[in-house]
Amino acid sequence: MGHYIKTEEHVTLFVEDIGHGRPIIFLHGWPLNHKMFEYQMNELPKRGFRFIGVDLRGYGQSDRPWEGYDYDTMADDVKAVIYTLQLENAILAGFSMGGAIAIRYMARHEGADVDKLILLSAAAPAFTKRPGYPYGMRKQDIDDMIELFKADRPKTLADLGKQFFEKKVSPELRQWFLNLMLEASSYGTIHSGIALRDEDLRKELAAIKVPTLILHGRKDRIAPFDFAKELKRGIKQSELVPFANSGHGAFYEEKEKINSLIAQFSNS
C-alpha cells in the first residue's frame, strides 16, 4: 500500500509499504525514486520483510518544494517517515545519494529506531574531491553537469545512466531507468547535485554505532570503490562486500546476490 506522509508544512512524501515483518527502509539515489528497487520490492516481502520505499522530496510521487534538498532536511524527512509509521528495529538501506542521507540520519538523529544500516554503492563519505580526500569527481565536474541539466536534461540524464551499469543490460531497461530519472523535478535534481558536490560526512562516520553492511561494485564509475574503503575504515561495526564485476548499478546487476545478502544481514 502507499502512504502520503507530511514531513513539514506543504511537503508530503510518498512511501510504498509492502509486506509484513521486520521493516527495511530504502532510500533511492540521485535522481531516481523508490521504483529503482523493483527487484528488491519483488523479493524481500517473500522472505518475511516489510519493504518501505521512500520517494525523497522532489522525486517520484512526492511533493516538489523549491528548497530542502540538503542532507539535513532529507534526514529530517526520513525521521518523519519513521515516526509516522511507528517503525522500530528497522534496517535503513541507502543507495548512492540515499546512502549519504542514511549516514546523515544516523548521525543527526542518533540512529533513532534503526538497528542496522546498509550502504549500497553509497555516494559517501564525500562525492567530490577535497583536501585529504582525492576520490570522486571534481566540484567543477558537478557544476558542468548542472549547466548541462539546464540546457538538455533528458540527454544529460541519458548519458549519466550509461555510466550506471558495467554489465550489458537491455535497451528497454536503460529506457525504464531514464524514465525514472525524468520523473524527478528539474530544480530538485539540480539542488541535490549541489548537496552532493558540497556535503562531507567523514566526521560523522564515527557516530554510526550499529552493524553496517557496505555493498559496492569494484567497477563503479560514479561512486568509486575507494568510497567503500573509506566507509569501512570509518564505521567500526562494518563489513564490506565487494562485487568484482559490477558498477554503480549492482542493485540490478547482482540482484540475486544482493537480495540474499540483505536478507541474511537483516536476519542476523
From Swiss-Prot:
Residue positions of the active site: S96, D220, H248
CC annotations in GO: membrane
Keywords from the UniProt entry: Hydrolase
GO molecular function terms listed in the Swiss-Prot or TrEMBL record: hydrolase activity
Span of domain AB hydrolase-1: 23-254
Enzyme class: hydrolase
Pfam families: Abhydrolase_1
InterPro entries with a match to the protein in the record: AB_hydrolase_1 (IPR000073), AB_hydrolase_fold (IPR029058), AB_hydrolase_sf (IPR050266), Epox_hydrolase-like (IPR000639)
EC assignment: 3.-.-.-
Family: Belongs to the AB hydrolase superfamily.
Entry protein name: AB hydrolase superfamily protein YisY
Source organism per UniProt: Bacillus subtilis (strain 168)
Gene name in the database record: yisY
